[in-house]
Amino acid sequence: MGRFGMSPGPNVAITYCRLCNWLLRAAWMGQELLSTFAEELGSVTLIPDDTGGVFEVRIDGRLIWSRKEHGRFPEIKELKQIVRDEIAPRRDLGHVDHKEH
């Protein structure tokens, strides 16, 4: 059970290449998601993997970002928007949602 007797929110799992030393990147992205979605998320899990170049983000087991598929890491702004669209679609992310000029 989560806070106030409610069920815990969704889990975000970040699988990262241990051999590539991407722990800090994964941890930073996890911290950003926890800070932004403190009320909505149940947990963020970091999963080290020895698969070369792997960097994947999943919500409750469903893949939402793959470095292999996209050919790059997500920008934190776009990752927050993807997570928001999945767990709190009506939520305004403030400056993250505003277009740059």
Regions found by a protein language model. Give the residues of each.
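Domain-level signature for proteins that mediate thiol-based redox and metal-cofactor handling
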Residues: 1-101
